[in-house]
Amino acid sequence: MLYMLTGSMAANLYAMPRMTRDLDLVVAVSAKNLELFPALFPEEHYYLSLEAALVAVQDFSCFNLIHLATMIKIDIMVRKPEAYRVHEFSRRQLHKINDHPIWVVSKEDLILSKLEWARHSLSERQLGDVRNLLSTECDFEYLNTWAKHLHLTDILTRVTA
């Protein structure tokens, strides 16, 4: 199954860490691939609603896993078929966390995603994460190109001002 870590946990790899309560994963998954989930996430260790997962796959939305021992929630977002989302997924980067290889969204694509979330939710936390990420080295040409394409130029300009 193809995946990438995104959200605040990914941001913690690129910039000053902040506390977060969950994990966010983007997965490239089909209804047929869902058959693998019970083996990957056995019910004695995880709560998973296959019905909710199937709806999420059909709608390109999200569903949750909960690790029962720690009660950590994992938000699983089904990768959308839009050109940018496919491109974003192709740019994911392999990181090592505690000697485990983990696919992670690129820093610039994470910034763009957080700008999108902030635009829709008006979340100051997302904008704070963006400012934190922008305080490190970034590919501004890439950011500006995709911000224009995704209609995020105004919010990116506001955050960088």
Question: Where are the regions that the model predicts?
Answer:
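Compositionally biased terminal segments of proteins
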Residues: 1-161
